[in-house]
């Protein structure tokens, strides 16, 4: 059975994520407030950002950049 949540990105009710896709408190917040559709859109944008900016996800600085972009893209409040 699918979980329906109010997605703060799409501003409508939609199918929620099947499991938390991000660690920590931010991951819990995303799980409760971001839909699968919005997360898929973010993953596409994330891939473009990583490739165009040649970011290395093993580097903490680059991961921080992606996290900031994710928060902005998904309209997440500061935690």
Swiss-Prot record:
Alphabetized Gene3D superfamilies for the sequence: Fe(II) trafficking protein YggX
Pfam families noted in UniProt: Iron_traffic
GO biological process terms, semicolon-separated: cellular response to oxidative stress
UniProt KW keywords: Iron
GO molecular function: iron ion binding
Highest taxon, organism lineage: Bacteria
A cellular component term, taken from the record's GO annotations: cytosol
Disulfide pattern: none
InterPro entries the record matches: Fe_traffick_prot_YggX, Fe_traffick_prot_YggX_sf
Entries under PANTHER family matching the protein: FE(2+)-TRAFFICKING PROTEIN-RELATED
Family membership: Belongs to the Fe(2+)-trafficking protein family.
Function summary: Could be a mediator in iron transactions between iron acquisition and iron-requiring processes, such as synthesis and/or repair of Fe-S clusters in biosynthetic enzymes.
Complexes and interactors: Monomer.
Protein name as catalogued: Probable Fe(2+)-trafficking protein
Organism: Blochmanniella floridana
